[in-house]
Amino acid sequence: MIASKFGIGQQVRHSLLGYLGVVVDIDPEYSLDEPSPDELAVNDELRAAPWYHVVMEDDDGQPVRTYLAEAQLRSEMRDEHPEQPSMDELARTIRKQLQAPRLRN
C-alpha cells in the first residue's frame, strides 16, 4: 500500500508556480492512459509515487483540473484565501461531503 502525503479536499500549492489548488482525487501511481511528450520525461520513481487530480484557477478565475506528482505539491497552511474564495469553498464542500454520513437502504 502506498501512503499519500495529501488528502482529498486538502488545499495545496504548486511548489514551483505557487498556484493554490484543491485535491479532488488521488492515484497511487501515474495512471493516465496516454502520456504526453512532457509526461514521458518523468522518471520511473516519480511515476511510482502518488499523483493527484487538483483543481486550480487560471488567470481568469476559471477552474482548471490538473494532474500533478506528489513532488510538485506542498501543503497549504492557511484555510482562508480572500483572493481565491472559490478554492476555499471547494475545499470546504469536499471535506463536508467526506464527513457526511451515508444512508443505507
From Swiss-Prot:
Name of one Pfam family that matches: YccV-like
Gene3D superfamilies, per the entry: Hemimethylated DNA-binding domain (2.30.30.390)
InterPro entries according to UniProt: Hemimethylated_DNA-bd_dom, Hemimethylated_DNA-bd_sf, HspQ
Location in the cell: Cytoplasm
Chief location category: cytoplasm
Gene Ontology cellular component terms for the protein in this record: cytoplasm
UniProt keyword annotations, A-Z: Cytoplasm, Stress response
GO biological process annotation, one example: response to heat
Gene Ontology molecular function: any one: DNA binding
Stated family: Belongs to the HspQ family.
Role this protein plays: Involved in the degradation of certain denaturated proteins, including DnaA, during heat shock stress.
HAMAP family: HspQ (MF_01194)
Name this protein carries in UniProt: Heat shock protein HspQ
Protein species of origin: Salmonella choleraesuis (strain SC-B67)
